Amino acid sequence: MPREIITLNVGQCGNQLGSEFFKKICSEHGILPDGSLSTNEFIDDRKDVFFYQADDQRYVPRSINIDLEPRVLDSIRTSEWSNFYNPENFIIPTNNGAGNSWANGYYTTEKMSEIEEIIDREVEHCDSLEGFFFCHSICGGTGSGLGSKIMEMISEKYPKNILTSFSVMVKENPDVVVSPYNSILTLRRLITECQSVVVFDNSALADITHTQFGVDEATVFDMNSIISSSMSAFTANLRFPSTLYNSLNSLMIHLCPSRFSHFLMTSYTPLRQVNQISSRTSAIDVMKRLIQPQNIMARTRLKEGKYISMCDFFQGDVSYDEINEALQRFTDRRLAEFVPWNKEAIKVVHTRVSPLVKRGNRMSGMLLANNTSIRYYFQDILKAFDQMFKKRVYLESYREQFHDNFQEFEESKEIVKCVIEEYAKAESIEYSDYSYPIHKYLKGIAKEKIAE
């Protein structure tokens, strides 16, 4: 019995990414832009995870598209996919957007009741909801601010369902000058409201695009295409189920053993055009490529960290014997360094592939990993925030919405610092006795709010 997942695409980046993801999985399930099927051929899949059938038998995505600026939503509604989405699930903006400010996005309250109503309606359409996917950027105003508000609402209203975020971050040369403010405030919600967060970094995606496709300057389409390939592989076992990790819950139990250190890195190989000819590769080659720093979709000091957990997903013409042999060689050679307290840190999964999609290679692989080096990424964001906040620059919209009280910044900073510390402690054998200061800090904040 499939368990459904509702996808929320928030902000410009989130809607562009969500659109590419659905195009990708539509091709795998034989769903055309109007929601009809491209073939009557039987496919042993679970379309119901991300789609439902309307009265006219068309497949409609369990997708909610939200933005405070009309451009991206209008481009979707006027494209060849205009009849694919449920028109009632578009949140049409009535103002000029969030102005790249987290505070403006977070305090845009006039749309929250409409958003909540749409989410409730989609939940009612599900027989057994497993969770929510959340696509957004943490740097702009809508994806970060309004996105944070929506995450809080989902976490409070549906605490038993998994909230997984696909978060695009910018650490180097951000286009949005207040990105450090937006990022630190959003990281707080990603820590406290989500059960897992898959991190994507624009600079890493641009480098991968240049290396794999020879593109001098990566476009949004190029980067979203890479992310959607990863998301497709991530969800393959949910949509084409096998015997292992065919639910979000089973996967998260392995990847995120701690409540708050749930930030995941990903890589995908090979990223080649369909018409490119590639040499025959092996499972061990795929496993080695997946952990190469240049293939990870977030730039961290990977060699200075340790893996808390990892899961390799194989697709294509590869046997279980070859996969198990590759796993044995991988562990015997100690090709990756793991934390000392997790003896079951690495898992491998063979996922089925759609018979409708032409493949340009014998096999492909996708990595999902929880690595302690992510703390260095957060440290860089924290450093950028401190440099700006100490100067008290670009605070106009935040000062207005926060009424000159910047406690929100201070609390967010402390929560991020707690997670950085937790990832550092996770590298030692004493981690099992760790006291988790973030729990104490969050309880303190809760008591203060009750007192108010």
Curated annotation (Swiss-Prot):
GO terms for cellular component: centrosome; cytoplasm; gamma-tubulin ring complex; microtubule; nucleus; spindle. It comes from the Eukaryota. Keywords: Cytoplasm, Cytoskeleton, GTP-binding, Microtubule, Nucleotide-binding, Nucleus. Pfam families: Tubulin, Tubulin_C. Coiled coil: none annotated. Gene3D superfamilies: Helix hairpin bin, Tubulin/FtsZ, C-terminal domain, Tubulin/FtsZ, GTPase domain. Disruption phenotype: RNAi-mediated knockdown results in a severe disorganization of microtubules in the nucleus and impaired cell growth. This is Tubulin gamma chain. The lineage of its organism: Eukaryota, Amoebozoa, Evosea, Archamoebae, Mastigamoebida. GTP binds at C139, G140, G141, T142, G143, S144, G145. The keyword 4Fe-4S does not apply. GO terms for biological process: cytoplasmic microtubule organization; meiotic spindle organization; microtubule cytoskeleton organization; microtubule nucleation; mitotic cell cycle; mitotic sister chromatid segregation; mitotic spindle organization. One of its GO terms (molecular function) is GTP binding. Its main location: cytoplasm. SMART domains: Tubulin, Tubulin_C. Belongs to the tubulin family. It is found in: Cytoplasm, Cytoskeleton, Microtubule organizing center, Centrosome; Nucleus. Tubulin is the major constituent of microtubules. The gamma chain is found at microtubule organizing centers (MTOC) such as the spindle poles or the centrosome, suggesting that it is involved in the minus-end nucleation of microtubule assembly.
